[in-house]
Structures are given as structure tokens and as C-alpha cells.
Swiss-Prot record:
R repeat boundaries on the chain: 56-62, 93-99, 132-138
Compositionally biased tracts (Gly residues): 144-160
Keyword Repeat: yes
Organism: Oryza sativa subsp. japonica (Rice)
InterPro entries the record matches: GRP1/2 (IPR040417)
UniProt name for this protein: Putative glycine-rich cell wall structural protein 1
One Gene Ontology cellular component: extracellular region
Amino acid sequence: MARKVIALAFLLLLTISLSKSNAARVIKYNGGESGGGGGGGGGGGGGGNGSGSGSGYGYNYGKGGGQSGGGQGSGGGGGGGGGGSNGSGSGSGYGYGYGQGNGGAQGQGSGGGGGGGGGGGGGGSGQGSGSGYGYGYGKGGGGGGGGGGDGGGGGGGGSAYVGRHE
């Protein structure tokens, strides 16, 4: 009987200890660093074609008394080749930030377009495109940061979208 009581007491203490460490882990998680996108490739020379694309995604989450950082993602496009070649590139970025409780959140995303190829002795053409998306959300005592995004194309167009702000 004594062994059963000791075993039950040990299990109870272990359960309480684990639940406390899990709660602390949730509160301490205040948003990490977000990753950036990759860059595109370069084109070939002498009548060759070159194209590249890159994209990035960032996500951050904060809960409790913590403050979440801004999610940030970006991608750069590729450049074209020389000597009568064509070059194209595209880039896109997405960022998301979320804060709950006393924390604020902000999201930011950006993407830059690629540059076109130049003609060395021959004609060359280039095009690029870029897009960005940002989202910010805050709940409880914290204010949500503004979502911001921007994108610019090298030789091409760019677009920007601002996400929800609460």
C-alpha cells in the first residue's frame, strides 16, 4: 500500500512539473527570426536565354506577455545573359506576424523583380516582376502592427498589398 501511495505521489509531481514547463515554453515563445527568399540564376552568353526566380516566406507568433516580431520574406529575380539573349526574373515575398495578449505584431513582405539581359553586339531584351504581401494582427492588450509589402521589377512591373490591421 505504501508503495502505491509513493508511486502515485511521484506521478502527480511529475505531471505538475511537465505542465509548468510546457506553459513556460508557450509564454517564452515570442516569435523567431524569419527566413529570406533565394535569388534567381543568371543567363548564358552568345544567343542564350537566362531566367531566374526567388521567393521567401516569414512567420512569427507571440503569445502571453511577449511581443512578436515581424515576419519578413523576400525573393530576388534572376538576370539575363549577354549577346542577343533574353533575360527574365521574378521575385515574391510574404510576411506574417501575430501577437496575443500584451504583445504587438507586425508583418512585412517584399519581392524584387529580375533585371533583363543586355545585348553585346546583338539586341537584348529583359523583363522583371515583383510582388510583396504583409499582414499584421494584434489581440488583447496589444496593438496590431501594420502589414506592409512592396515589390519592384527591374525592367518590369511591381505590386504591393497591405494586409489587415486590427
